A protein has these predicted regions:
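Solvent-exposed, non-transmembrane regions of membrane-associated and secreted proteins
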Residues: 1-201
Length: 201
């Protein structure tokens, strides 16, 4: 059985819904990430101690597997708060100069550490269920094959305002950070990164 990393032991004892911790150096993004596969929106408006909280706590989409048999992509949601907290600062990734200063994202699960490098960042939206015209980034969890993986990466790269020079190969581990954005109704801003280091790299 996998062992909980020492730094997570106390937090895990307090709340075993914790999946890990997300940090982007030089920003306010430094938060626990929750995972409740039976109730996707559980932490939408709850803090780590399960008390009501408007900003909620970042959480992993229930369709992802962040630990054993990890899905190619781990999709993490967080609120965009006017006060600047939670995932507000992700929107700055639209600007290449911000990207250049914040190329790496740290996402440690409770079992292993991981550093990710940003591939791209883009505006999108949540489309109607019957929409077939647009690519739905929020439905990509596991690629059936290389072509499906490459389609996701191509979508990310082609919708990013600058070329990060970073891409991903089929078999790489991805994280996708998603937050609300006001450019359109049901707008979203999305940052995608690939794992470059960790305990097993």
């Amino acid at each position: 059985e996998k062992k909980i990393l020492k730094k997570f032991e106390k937090l895990y004892e307090k709340n075993s819904d914790i999946a890990g911790w997300l940090t982007i150096d030089g920003t306010t993004i430094d938060y626990p990430v929750m995972y409740t596969p039976d109730d996707n929106d559980y932490y939408l408006h709850l803090d780590f101690d399960k008390n009501w909280s408007d900003p909620g706590t970042p959480f992993i989409d229930m369709n992802c597997r962040p630990f054993d048999d990890r899905t190619d992509n781990v999709l993490i949601y967080g609120h965009n708060m006017k006060s600047g907290i939670m995932f507000r600062e992700l929107l700055q990734y639209e600007d290449e100069s911000f990207y250049k200063k914040h190329k790496n994202i740290k996402f440690d699960t409770v079992y292993e550490t991981g550093t990710y490098e940003v591939i791209g960042a883009f505006r999108s939206e949540i489309y109607p269920d019957d929409d077939t015209e647009h690519y739905h980034y929020y439905e990509f969890f596991n690629a059936a094959d290389k072509a499906e993986f490459d389609e996701y990466i191509d979508f990310v790269k082609s919708n990013t305002a600058y070329d990060s020079g970073v891409t991903a190969e089929y078999g790489d581990e991805l994280i996708t950070l998603s937050t609300c954005a006001s450019h359109t109704e049901d707008g979203r801003f999305v940052v995608v990164a690939r794992r470059i280091t960790g305990d097993d790299k």
